[in-house]
Amino acid sequence: MPNRCLYISSFKDFLAENPLAVLGALHNNYHGEALTTTDEAWKGEIDILQRVLQPLKEEVAQIIFEYEIPRLGKRIDVVLLLRGLIFCLEFKVGQKDALQADVEQVMDYALDLKNFHRFSHDKVIVPVLIPTRHKSSTKEFKPSVSGNFQVRRSLS
């Protein structure tokens, strides 16, 4: 995956890695100078993922930061390849609410990945929006027309 992402690792190696080393790899592979907001977002993403993925450290799985969708130039914050599924994660660091535009953004990324990445055509892609200051979450899912999954909004 040359130049398609800024960082790629197995879950096990990512979870054992010092967060500053992961951040350093992101900076080293980034073309240009990362803004302070980008740097803070990456730090937040690394912290969250190293915490929540810990129970999965023995899984044969990969984590990819800043994956560029072929032919479109869009970058997905994080892609997780786990148990035959592709998780497309879009972080909104410091944000409390899941805005409709953000939901549409992560759904578009998942659809773009399915349409423009040949190894994803026949895979289930799970788009996940993560507003990091949101107080609740939902575990309710429903299949969408394209065979992907879409989060059903919770009423609580």
Question: What does each of the following model-derived ranges do?
Answer:
Residues M1-S156:
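Accessory nucleic-acid engagement/destabilization modules that flank
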